Amino acid sequence: TSKVKIGRLITVAYLALCKNSRKTCPADKSDSIRWCPIDDLPRLPFDHKEIIEAAIQEIRNWVEKEPAIIFDYMPMKFTAFQLRRTYEVIYNREMDVRNFHKKMNSLDYVVPTDDMQDGVAHRAARYYRFDKVKYNQQRSKFNKI
């Protein structure tokens, strides 16, 4: 095998959030382009792993600065499990179910609906929705302090 010698290399990385239902475009013309779970990335060249780690930290910073960003990537109605799993993926750690429910229920802008899951083998979960008006009211109260 011969190694390619590279004098200098500049990597430009772009960061964007998109829903996980998004598919790669067939026009990409490459079989190697695919979505990968963050905890199961393929071996990456150069400093690309560090770039991805920095991007993940940046997403965490976005969520801490503006928590509503999470709800842009949730279905219109979602379960507590779906919301908790989203946070677990972002922060790469399991969260205590009871503590998460307490925290979630303390947020005025996460509103329970009358809808319940159907067609599931386990106890049906309640659906919630994000109330942007309540969120903005709460944020404006906080900003006045």
Regions found by a protein language model. Name each.
Residues 3, 41-44, 117:
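Alpha-helix initiation/capping motif
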Residues 65-145:
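Core RNA-modification/binding signature centered on pseudouridine synthases
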